[in-house]
Amino acid sequence: MKEFDYKHSPLREGQFRLLNLHPARGSADLESNLVVRSLGTAVDSTSPILDQPSRALNPEPYRALSYTWGPPCQNDLFIKILADSRAFRIAIRLNLETALRQLRSPDREQFFWIDALCINQKNDDEKSSQIPEMWRIYTQAFSVCIWLGIHEDESATAMEFIKDCLDFEIFEQLVHDTQTSKKWAALAALMRRPWFSRRWIVQEIALAREATLHCGDKQVEWQDFADAISLFHSKQHEIRKLFRESTAFHNHPDYLDDVSELGATRLVEASANIFRKSDDNQIMKHLLSLEALMSMLSTFEASDPHDTVYAIL
């Protein structure tokens, strides 16, 4: 079946697209279809060119994917978009391709909102109209799925260590045992991942009903990660002593840097202070003024100056 580049058609006011990721295992091609949804309803896309809705559907729960785009690929990577017994394709970058393979279910369809696929990246007008709607998209998602990337720099150790940090019966031992210095170093390396420097993430996390953090084949709940980072921050001076006493780090107490300056620490603080939520995690109000939010977000990166404003509206 010959594949053609997919052509998004214009969205109507109040609509956005979702990616229906088809089940498969291992190295099988990434296959999907795009559906159009509005508040409270979703519609099938009967034409890959016109996106004309055919029938209303009960809203399917979806996850919003939060990730870094990464550099352009030297080798062409694509995801298949299936419609009307024809196969189309959209070029994707390596980090997204890796994320989709890791998150894909072997036996059931899953719905995702992914900016690179659900927004026509070749249409500036559509991007301008969809960006202000991101707060609605993230608020409606049943979960935000955070993709940090593949395993490297002992990240698997770090992901497991997060769970250990939340065991209060052994936490003090972790803070004072020199044998744990490598685990603290692995956690610090995880906290330096590029994802934690994106300005958009503050909005994405603050708006999330639930969020999970994924790295390789490991995952933890966002709140567990946030709690572990807060504990790490509160004990950083004691933990730095471990590195002073550890021959594995050449008695180098400054290996960790200042934990409070790491993007992950700033994100945990920022995302907790932007909104007040109800008991069921619904957004109630801003806790900070626009000026205060702008100042708080100044440490996070944005590729376009306008993104700073969009990220907090």
Where in this protein do the model-derived segments appear?
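Beta-strand-rich binding-surface signature
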Residues: 59-64, 109-116, 135, 143-145, ...
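Metal-dependent phosphate/diphosphate-handling catalytic cores characterized by acidic Asp/Glu clusters
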Residues: 1-113, 119-125, 129, 150-180, ...
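Hydrophobic, mid-to-C-terminal alpha-helical segments
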Residues: 126-132, 142, 185-313
